[in-house]
Amino acid sequence: MKKDIHPDYHMITVKMTDGTEYQTRSTWGSEGDVMTLEIDPTAHPAWTGGQGRMLDSGGQVAKFNKRFGGLTLKR
């Protein structure tokens, strides 16, 4: 096996949308960083059976609706 070709794995903390946290090893960030999730399996409709709504924290849905809201399909 070649040396110094593998990424550096270190411990990070992942913070879920409900506030729970857990530690895992990752190549993301650096040792001790906190990854805050905006969407996770406890809040995403695909895993919750469609209950609840997804938060649009980046305004992407509003931006899409502003740009394409008046668009209609011609038949």
Curated annotation (Swiss-Prot):
Pfam families associated with the record: Ribosomal_L31 (PF01197)
GO molecular function: rRNA binding; structural constituent of ribosome
Source organism superkingdom: Bacteria
GO cellular component, one term: ribonucleoprotein complex
Keywords: Ribonucleoprotein, Ribosomal protein, RNA-binding, rRNA-binding
PROSITE patterns recorded: RIBOSOMAL_L31 (PS01143)
Listed GO biological process terms: translation
SUPFAM superfamilies (UniProt xref): L28p-like
Summary of the function given for this chain in its UniProt record: Binds the 23S rRNA.
Family from the record: Belongs to the bacterial ribosomal protein bL31 family. Type A subfamily.
NCBIfam families xref list: L31 (TIGR00105), PRK00528.1 (NF001809)
Assembly with partners or alone: Part of the 50S ribosomal subunit.
Protein name: Large ribosomal subunit protein bL31
Organism encoding this protein: Sphingopyxis alaskensis (strain DSM 13593 / LMG 18877 / RB2256)
